[in-house]
Amino acid sequence: MTSTLIPKETSTPGGRDLRDARADYFFKLLLTAAVAFVLIALVSAALSMLWGGRQALQLQGVSFFYSTEWNPVENKYGALTPIYGTIVTALIAMLIAMPVSLGIAFFLTEVAPRWLRTPIGTAIELLAGIPSIIYGMWGLFVLVPVMTDYITPFLNDHIGTLPLIGTLFQGPPLGIGTLTAGFVLAIMVIPFISSMMREVFLTVPTQLKESAYALGSTKWEVSWNIVLPYTRSAVIGGMFLGLGRALGETMAVAFVIGNSVRLSPSLLTPGTTIAALIANDFGEATETYRSALLLLGFVLFIVTFAVLVIARLMLLRLSRKEGN
C-alpha cells in the first residue's frame, strides 16, 4: 500500500493570529505617527512664528494688533492695516465666487448636455491648477487697465456719491487696489469651489431628482429645493475652504493690491494683506522688522485657523439639526 504523504502545516492558527495582531499593531502605530507628525508640524509652525515675533511683541505690546501705524524706520508696527486688507479682499472674493461657483456647478450637473459636461469640467479643473503668479500677472496687465479706464470711473460717478456705501467706492483711477485684488482672488477660487460643488451635487440620488421632475418641477426648483438642501453641509464646507485659500493667497494679491500700508475705507485705493506684506519685505527686513513680519505670520495662522474652526462648528450644528 502506498502511503499518502500529508504536508506538514507550517503555521498554526495561534501563530497566524499572533502575526495578524503584530501587523495590526504596527499599522495602528504608523497611522498614529502620521497624525502626530501633522499635529507636531502645525504646532511647531505656530510656535516658531510666535517665538520669532517675540521682539516685536515686546516692543509694541498689545497695540501691535490694533494700531494702524506701520513705520519700519522708527520701529513702529501696527498690524491692523494688513489684517483689514486680508479680511476685506477675501470677503470680496467670496461674494463674487460663491454665486458664480454655484451657477457653474448647477449648469454642469443639471443643465449642460452630456457631451459638454466633460470638456467644461476638465477646463475648470485645469484652471484650478494654474499657479497663482499667472493670475497675478493677468490681473496686472489685463484687469488693472480695465479697472483704470472703465470700472473705477463708473464706480466713482454712480456709486461713490451714494450715502453710507459711497465712501467705499471713492478714489483715484489707479486700477490697483483692494477691489482689484478681490476680483483676482475670486477668479482664482472659482475653479476650486465650483469643482468641489460639482462633485458634491453628483452625490444627490437620481431618484430624488427624477421624482421632482415627475411632479412637474423645473430645473430651477430641483436645483434650489432638492440639490442644494441635500448638499448644504458640503456646500458650506467648500465655501469655508475657499475662504481659507483666499485668506492666505500671496503672489496674485501682491501684483495688484498696491502694497500700501495705509488704512483707507475705500476699496479703490492701494492696500496690502498679511501675506503680500511678508512676501514683499521679508527678504530685506532688519532684525526687528523681520520679527514684526513673523508675528504677522502668526496672526494670519490664527485667522485662518479660526475660519476653519468656525466652519467645523457650523457643520456640526447643521448635522445635529439634520439628525446625523
Curated annotation (Swiss-Prot):
PROSITE patterns: ABC_TM1. CDD domains: TM_PBP2. InterPro entries: MetI-like (IPR000515), MetI-like_sf (IPR035906), Phosphate_PstC (IPR011864), Phosphate_Transport_Permease (IPR051124). GO terms for cellular component: plasma membrane. It is found in: Cell inner membrane. The keyword Ion transport does not apply. Residues 83-311 form the ABC transmembrane type-1 domain. The chain crosses the membrane at residues 29-49, 87-107, 126-146, 173-193, 235-255, 291-311. Its main location: membrane. It holds the Pfam family BPD_transp_1. It is a multi-pass membrane protein. GO terms for biological process: phosphate ion transport. GO terms for molecular function: phosphate transmembrane transporter activity. Keywords: Cell inner membrane, Cell membrane, Membrane, Phosphate transport, Transmembrane, Transmembrane helix, Transport. The keyword Transferase does not apply. Part of a binding-protein-dependent transport system for phosphate; probably responsible for the translocation of the substrate across the membrane. Belongs to the binding-protein-dependent transport system permease family. CysTW subfamily. NCBIfam families: phosphate_pstC. This is Phosphate transport system permease protein PstC. It comes from Xylella fastidiosa (strain Temecula1 / ATCC 700964). The lineage of its organism: Bacteria, Pseudomonadati, Pseudomonadota, Gammaproteobacteria, Lysobacterales.
